[in-house]
């Protein structure tokens, strides 16, 4: 079923891609500056593209194996929909394409931002922010284009006459969910690989350059400087983009599947269709309003950090207010039942995103007390810096967790008509809250991608000796970027929590389809009741599979899910440690063997450091990524559906809290160091500074590798469970 209002969705995605192209061409018209600026930028660009090429080779080999597996399951054993292998490939392809285009833009934008900062602060902000907007608009444009393409395709190819009319939309939405696994798999490799790369280079550059040799950050004498700048792009542009692409698509697809399920029992295809299309329309209008917000961002010369933050906030807040108002109009025009309260669920999602962002800023910005206390602890040595940072990270989990808890309850109650027994509509409300949170992704991701562009611009200005005034401007842009990056991580974690919950609910729908595919038509309960599977509700399946805390299989799954979060963090932290060790050895070797590096008479071998980070990341990212894919499959085969539900609950709850803790502790350590570098507590080179450098070095893999990767672990385990639902139903012990 497709009505005229549906076509707004593909049109909005094309509009996003058109504006992304416009901003890219606008950026490319700017001058890159001096020959040295161009040369430094080309080093970073070549390193970034070299890394991405290697990463995509590894990912391609994993995709080949998984596509063969899915094809056997679909065409050999018939426990999966035949569209799954193709859907999986398109999800991975578009996610990879979004990362590639975003990173390509970022590597061209850094020198142009530095050169624009020679003119004015506002000029530098405009170039960096609109280059970041390319990433934001490419992600939402490709994501919504992929979703609308699959809806149109499946609507055309899945026959009406062979199925109950309401069952057709259930098949379409659950099949579309599977391309989310392709996006999730690609995102995990991008996040883990990019995180290991960037932190191996960063830790190596800091330990030997700052601590041992006493040279400043981004100094061209440091052999790991280029690798460090490359890492900003592969981790914070390609990695963040793939992460949020996955959340964006996952939230829309899960909500569409929940909408189809909520109205199956009504027998009305029209009501079902409206619930399926609503999240897509909200996302489509969000794209248009994000573009308006992007044009609203501008600032004055000599602006302070708070004024720069306000400039970005004007854009994001304008988009958020407009989407809040528009949502009610969309749902009313669409003719949704209970349209006002479902609209309130969308507002809840927006508010949860804002609260998590503000809480993250409070705990990680040097403008506020928590980070300043961590900075002050540097006066008594590195041990107290580590202790205070860990304490801050643990305390910082309270507000995000409470925000998500309140958001879940409110969105459930609003959509269900304040009836806790109306589980189908309540879960739809949680899904639509996740869509609401991500509806302004076009501009919120622009502020995230802006960070590494500004960071690289500062590095370029430092290496090219552009003068104090230019460095002052790039430092201001860089400081703003650090805050937006920390806030962006909080936003990504919060969106992962709500999306993960929506995916968990969608898993039950996939179980329903798996049973029907096996020829099962009726659920026979122990009390003698029987219900048609096609008409069974979420609650019916919970009772049928005995998903209660008294079931040992559920408890076993919960413990395994909690363990997975910590194992995953342990593997990625150790991976950074090993890769950083190789980088430290290489930087020390160059300082020792290449005479004249420290005096500036000889050029370091930048390419060798880039190569070490690339190889380290490729080698180390495979084990944690494969573990995340295998865990739900094995749990399903051994403990069945109940065990998988427990695994997803344990992974979601533990992973969310652990991710907030790691991201905020790492962000606080980073900005505590920067606070001292501004001249506080003795300034650069003091004992307090050296202590906070140690804290920052420990915090690097916290905030840029393990913490952000947990977002994807939460969603990927749910996606794998959904795709493998047929296997679990057919062959579990």
Predicted region positions:
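Hydrophobic packing and interface segments
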Residues: 1-733
């Amino acid at each position: 079923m497709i009505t005229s209002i549906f076509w707004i969705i593909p049109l909005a995605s094309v509009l996003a891609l058109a504006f992304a192209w416009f901003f890219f061409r606008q950026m490319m018209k700017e001058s890159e500056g001096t020959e040295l600026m161009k040369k430094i930028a080309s080093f970073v660009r070549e390193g970034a593209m070299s890394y991405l090429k290697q990463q995509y080779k590894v990912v391609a080999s994993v995709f080949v194996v998984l596509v063969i597996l899915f094809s056997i399951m679909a065409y050999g054993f018939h426990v999966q929909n035949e569209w799954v292998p193709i859907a999986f490939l398109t999800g991975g392809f578009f996610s990879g394409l979004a990362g590639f285009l975003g990173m390509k833009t970022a590597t061209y934008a850094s020198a142009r931002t530095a050169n624009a900062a020679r003119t004015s602060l506002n000029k530098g902000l405009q170039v960096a922010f609109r280059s970041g907007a390319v990433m934001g608009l490419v992600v939402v444009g490709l994501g919504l284009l992929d979703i609308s393409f699959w809806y149109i395709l499946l609507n055309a190819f899945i026959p009406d006459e062979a199925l109950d009319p309401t069952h057709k939309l259930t098949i379409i939405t659950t099949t579309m969910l599977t391309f989310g696994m392709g996006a999730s798999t690609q995102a995990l490799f991008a996040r883990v690989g990019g995180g290991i790369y960037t932190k191996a280079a960063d830790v190596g550059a800091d330990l030997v350059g700052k601590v041992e040799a006493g040279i400043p950050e981004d100094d061209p004498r440091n052999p790991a400087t280029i690798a460090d700048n490359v890492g900003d792009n592969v981790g914070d542009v390609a990695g963040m983009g793939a992460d949020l692409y996955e959340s964006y698509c996952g939230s829309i697809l899960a909500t569409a599947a929940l909408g189809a399920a909520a109205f199956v029992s009504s027998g009305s295809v029209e009501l079902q269709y409206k619930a399926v299309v609503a999240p897509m329309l909200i996302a489509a209008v969000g794209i248009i309003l994000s573009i308006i917000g992007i044009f609203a961002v501008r600032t004055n010369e000599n602006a302070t950090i708070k004024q720069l933050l306000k400039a970005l906030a004007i854009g994001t807040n304008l988009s958020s207010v407009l989407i809040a108002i528009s949502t009610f109009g969309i749902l009313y025009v669409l003719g949704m039942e209970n349209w006002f309260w479902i609209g309130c669920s969308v507002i809840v999602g927006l508010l949860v995103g804002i609260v998590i962002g503000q809480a993250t800023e409070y705990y990680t910005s040097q403008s506020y007390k928590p980070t300043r206390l961590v900075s002050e602890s540097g006066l008594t040595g590195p041990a107290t810096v580590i202790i205070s940072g860990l304490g801050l990270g643990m305390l910082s989990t309270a507000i995000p967790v409470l925000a998500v808890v309140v958001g879940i309850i409110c969105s459930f109650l609003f959509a269900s008509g304040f009836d806790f027994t109306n589980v189908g509509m309540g879960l739809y409300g949680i899904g639509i809250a996740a869509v609401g949170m991500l509806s302004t992704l076009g501009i919120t991701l622009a502020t995230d991608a802006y960070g590494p562009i500004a960071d690289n611009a500062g590095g370029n200005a430092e290496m090219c000796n552009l003068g104090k005034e230019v460095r002052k401007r790039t430092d201001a842009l860089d400081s703003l970027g650090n805050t937006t990056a920390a806030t962006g991580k909080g936003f990504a974690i919060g969106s992962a929590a709500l999306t993960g919950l929506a995916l968990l609910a969608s898993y039950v729908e996939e179980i329903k389809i798996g049973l029907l595919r096996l020829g099962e038509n009726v659920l026979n309960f122990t009390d003698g009741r029987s219900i048609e599977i096609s008409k069974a509700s979420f609650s019916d399946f919970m009772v049928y599979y005995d998903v209660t805390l008294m079931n040992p299989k559920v408890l076993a799954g919960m413990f395994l899910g909690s363990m997975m979060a910590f194992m995953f963090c342990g593997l990625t932290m150790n991976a950074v440690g090993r890769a950083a060790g190789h980088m430290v050895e290489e930087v020390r070797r160059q300082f020792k063997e290449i005479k004249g590096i420290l005096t500036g008479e000889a050029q370091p071998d930048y390419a060798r450091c880039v190569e070490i980070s690339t190889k380290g990341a490729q080698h180390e990212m495979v084990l944690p990524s494969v573990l995340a894919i295998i865990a739900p499959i094995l749990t399903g085969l051994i403990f069945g559906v109940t065990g998988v539900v427990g695994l997803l609950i344990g992974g979601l709850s533990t992973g969310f809290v652990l991710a907030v803790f790691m991201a905020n502790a790492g962000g606080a350590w980073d900005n505590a160091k920067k606070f001292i570098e501004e001249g506080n507590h003795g300034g650069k080179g003091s004992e307090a500074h050296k202590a906070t450098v140690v804290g920052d070095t420990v915090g690097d893999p916290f905030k840029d590798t393990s913490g952000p990767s947990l977002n994807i672990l939460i969603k990927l385990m749910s996606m794998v469970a959904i795709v493998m639902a047929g296997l679990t139903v057919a062959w579990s012990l």
